[in-house]
Amino acid sequence: MAVSSCSILGGCPRIFPSFECRSDPDFTGHFQSEKQKTRGFSGQIHGFSGQSLILRFPPNFVRQLSIKARRNCSNIGVAQVVAASWSNGPIASEEKAIGVVAPVIDSSCNNNNTEVVQSEFTDSNDSFLSSDGSLAVHAGERIGRGIVTDAITTPVVNTSAYLFKTTAQLIDFKEGRFASFEYGRYGNPTTKVLEEKISALEEAESTVLMASGMCACTVMLMALVPAGGHIVTTTDCYRRTRIFIQTILPKMGITATILDPADMDGLKSALEKHKVSLYFTESPTNPFLRCVDIELVSKLCHSKGAVVCIDGTFATPVNQKALPLGADLVVHSATKYIAGHNDVIAGCISGSKKLVETVRALHHVLGGVLNPNAAYMIIRGMKTLHLRVQQHNLTAMRMARLLEAHPKITRVYYPGLPSHPEHHIASRQMTGFGGVVSFEVAGDLNTTAKFVDALKIPYIAPSFGGCESIIDQPAIMSYWDLSPVERAQYGIKDNLVRFSLGIEDFEDLRMDVLQALDSI
């Protein structure tokens, strides 16, 4: 309990319970929303009623409350409920604020008679944030005017397990009456903030984070496709995903139809011929940046009861929102644009609560948990997501046009160009075309390698979506173990280059590319 030395009403001292105090030093807001009322406490302090009016906080009261919450509520889930209750509530005049009645709650944080409500930490309302830029900065971290703790930045919670005050509290948690965490593999407060942030950007009900994009893809496929089931996917995709679909899923009796991204007749035929459980594709795809008509595919698949999952890694939630277009799930390698700094590996799946919880259940069994320190780094990276993506989009578009006009480049693959086979689709369902440009150099493997080696700014490396520009020859970086004939089956030519444009100044990149082309 916290006692204010300056709250006297009719000569009666007022006792402030920690649960009910708002982190609001100017005392301009309500203390508690109506839904967070408690019951079961009828005691009085030294004869004074627990329902007196609160007048004002001492100057250092907020800081003391923050410390007391962490000391008294050693269960982090409870502490977040407490912190959320301090911060929540609409702005009100001081006259209205003075009149708010604050019920007293046992400061030990384990009153078994307390009505438990879901923490707004796990069910935040970001409706006052109207743009992707604001959501990327604040979603998941803002609770009304405040935040989940008194810190501006979300803290990293490094723990493998979470305690319960009593057995009764544990039972309440198991039966859904008490919001908290149990074991590190099942959830973490820092990771939860990141999940809420991604959900807000994707307009999803729920998101689950995993240790990598491949982890997210494989767990999703195993969770949603039954043994003996059938999936439809596309020819152009990340090679490791294709390997899993073609070599691992058959061991579970799962078969696949592999189609060109634009082959809608083939999709209709597969839906008629098979009981398709899932349609899964990237859009744009890797490395040719093909774009699937998400709205049309979703209508066709839903008519036959199939789930649609779109890998939107190349697009980002800023450039494309697959769920409003009709997809059921969207998966990302958060390693790429979402984290955006080439320093963390992660994956995520967003969609309806029902489907995501099905995936989450298997994820809890298999593991592949994202470290909370990595989650924090992604949260930090996402605060500049919209700014980075704008720069990626602009630089890539300008580079694609430059390359398409250059005599030493035979073909450019970029959905923002009218020459791209799905430009009309990309223009309809994307607000930007991303930061990756693939192209073919006029020459063989060695000529192309000479061009790549002559570049001074981009790093020769795998991955994409970071601040630094990265370039590679897929024939060498991703398909070197296959013969040229086998590579050709996937459209991978020796002169193909995948260029991930970073956030460097375009003029520097332009001059670098031109001098490298001059060298061949």
Regions found by a protein language model. Give the residues of each.
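Well-ordered alpha/beta subsegment
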Residues: 203-204, 230, 494, 502-517
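Short amphipathic alpha-helical segments
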Residues: 179, 205, 345, 374, ...
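Conserved N-terminal alpha-helix of the aminotransferase class I/II PLP-enzyme fold
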Residues: 2, 14-38, 44-113, 156, ...
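Mobile, glycine-enriched helix-loop/loop "lid" segments at the mouths of ligand-binding/catalytic clefts
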Residues: 126-130, 136, 140-181, 354-357, ...
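Conserved PLP-enzyme active-site core in the AAT-like
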Residues: 2-14, 107-128, 133, 138-148, ...
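Hydrophobic side chains in well-ordered alpha-helices
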Residues: 194, 359, 447-451, 509-513
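Conserved C-terminal alpha-helix-loop-beta "cap" of PLP-dependent enzymes
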Residues: 14-52, 56, 145, 408-497, ...
